[in-house]
């Protein structure tokens, strides 16, 4: 009865929203079941480009998520990027047009200070997605592999061909393919640099 009352006054509703999922155990995971561990990775300095080809660089440990990019985000107080808010750039390899936006959760001293928001790489992506009302562009299946079908938001023929090269691959295999392609296209600045970060893991994993 309590639920029906909530439903009648609009207090109960359905919503599409991201959840935590373990690809090994194939199960949903509660926040209480997460534990933070140090995890080694690599920063990749990647060029997004304005209409005239001028680059703007982000640094990411998850280049395999480039196809899921919805926007670039920097802190509203970051003088390096204030002039770019509201402008658009194109993602490397996939040539998807994305906006440059401001959000206070962007860390000025992390990487290049400007980050790509992908749906979804971490909880910060979820926060940005909700607050800025960004599109949802999932590319990873429940089994941890890249989806088989090329998404509709990738319209550039070369971009669709690039995505097809990663379809069905694990994120680790897709990462190598993407990094090699970025290097060949001239969109990877220098070589990846080692880093360590705290990452949430399922406590049983």
Segments and roles (model prediction):
Residues 152-155, 205:
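Short, surface-exposed amphipathic charged segments that create phosphate/polyanion-binding patches used
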Residues 1-149, 153:
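NTP-handling and nucleic-acid-processing catalytic cores
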Residues 144, 178, 201-204:
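Active-site cavity-forming subdomains of large catalytic enzyme subunits
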